[in-house]
């Protein structure tokens, strides 16, 4: 008989969970408190009210009680449930607040959720799936993955994680890595621009008017500080912007208010393993100027936080509270305005 997950979780103490998967899979990952043995071994042990869990494709004796969806079903349920329950305040509420406060989704939008395979974009996909089920504003979603030339095992990891999390991905191929591997200068900058161009182009080809990227709160404040320290200017990563090269297309960042540490907590709680940077250049190079600057900025923020716990939020809020009368100059629509222009003697 099939025992539904909700019933099991509600009445855990009534069952003894028997995991019949192979030993290697069990040792790699299992439900706490479960016993690894075969159905026959469980019968020999005369375990009271055993509930069997295996692979979703396993065929069970009709006389056995087995968990709906198998081990994969349990992992999916736990990952989805933890977004709206255990980490509701840290993830779900921050996501919906960003969508609302920054007006990221409008009626009848068709959004391409761009998945790189990392923790941020995978979580974003699950948040969109949850929002799509409950939103009062009608919108459509495509979950797209651009393969810039990943090694086979990296591509497989993305596909396996999408299957495990029940994300209906669409994969399209490019050879961006081959192009940037041959560049001597600024490969990361060029790679990022090429990626975005391909994402915009593919999204538009399937009828989307927006692409969603997985940049989070920490990305935004690091970018703010980097622009000052390394670029000699004041600007930040906005929660949305219109494309300059693809008319009618817009980029949105729904994770804008979510802290990276909370994404990591969700990932680790669910024992998920996502793709890290799989760039050929990063793997082959001893130094990466763009990445090292971001890392240095991240360390600086961490150091400042030791004496000022509010430093991260203060950096974030500084971009909402710019006093134009108290700056030497600023640009608006490519026109430079200097403080002396309106200074009266």
Language-model features: where?
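A short, well-structured beta->alpha microelement
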Residues: 1-9, 33-43
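Flexible, polar/low-complexity N-terminal or interdomain linker segments that lie immediately upstream
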Residues: 1-28, 72, 76-86
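Conserved beta-strand elements of the Class I
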Residues: 16-18, 51, 112-113
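Catalytic cysteine-centered active loop of the rhodanese-like fold, especially the PTP/DSP P-loop
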Residues: 37-71
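ATP-dependent adenylation/nucleotidyltransferase module used to activate substrates
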Residues: 82-226, 230, 261-262, 268-269
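Catalytic subdomain that performs nucleotidyl-dependent activation
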Residues: 140-141, 219-300
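The feature marks non-catalytic terminal segments
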Residues: 272-345
């Amino acid at each position: 008989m099939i025992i539904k997950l909700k019933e099991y979780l509600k009445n855990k103490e009534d069952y003894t969970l028997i995991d019949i998967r192979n030993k290697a899979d069990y040792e790699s990952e299992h439900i706490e408190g479960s016993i690894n043995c075969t159905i026959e071994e469980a019968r020999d042990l005369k375990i009271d009210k055993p509930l069997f869990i295996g692979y979703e494709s396993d065929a069970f004796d009709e006389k056995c009680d087995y968990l709906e969806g198998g081990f994969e079903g349990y992992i999916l349920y736990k990952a989805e449930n933890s977004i709206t329950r255990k980490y509701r305040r840290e993830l779900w509420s921050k996501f919906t607040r960003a969508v609302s406060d920054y007006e990221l989704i409008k009626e009848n939008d068709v959004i391409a959720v761009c998945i790189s395979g990392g923790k941020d974009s995978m979580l974003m996909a699950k948040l969109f799936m949850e929002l799509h089920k409950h939103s009062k504003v009608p919108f459509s979603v495509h979950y797209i993955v651009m393969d810039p030339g990943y090694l086979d095992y990296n591509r497989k990891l993305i596909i396996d994680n999408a299957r495990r999390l029940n994300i209906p991905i669409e994969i399209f191929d490019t050879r961006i890595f081959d192009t940037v591997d041959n560049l001597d200068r600024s490969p990361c900058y060029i790679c990022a621009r090429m990626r975005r161009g391909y994402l915009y182009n593919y999204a538009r080809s399937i009828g989307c008017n927006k692409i969603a990227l997985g940049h989070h709160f920490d990305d935004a404040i690091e970018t703010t500080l980097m622009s000052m320290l390394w670029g000699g200017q004041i600007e930040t990563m906005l929660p949305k912007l219109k494309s300059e090269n693809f008319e009618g297309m817009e980029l949105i960042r729904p994770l804008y208010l979510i802290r990276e540490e909370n994404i990591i907590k969700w990932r680790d709680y669910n024992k998920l393993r996502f793709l890290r940077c799989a760039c050929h250049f990063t793997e082959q190079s001893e130094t990466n100027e763009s990445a090292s600057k971001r890392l240095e900025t991240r360390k600086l923020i961490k150091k400042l936080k030791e004496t000022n716990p509010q430093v991260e939020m203060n950096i974030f809020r500084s971009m909402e509270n710019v006093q134009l009368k108290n700056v030497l100059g600023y640009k608006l629509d490519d026109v430079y305005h200097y403080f002396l222009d309106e200074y009266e003697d």
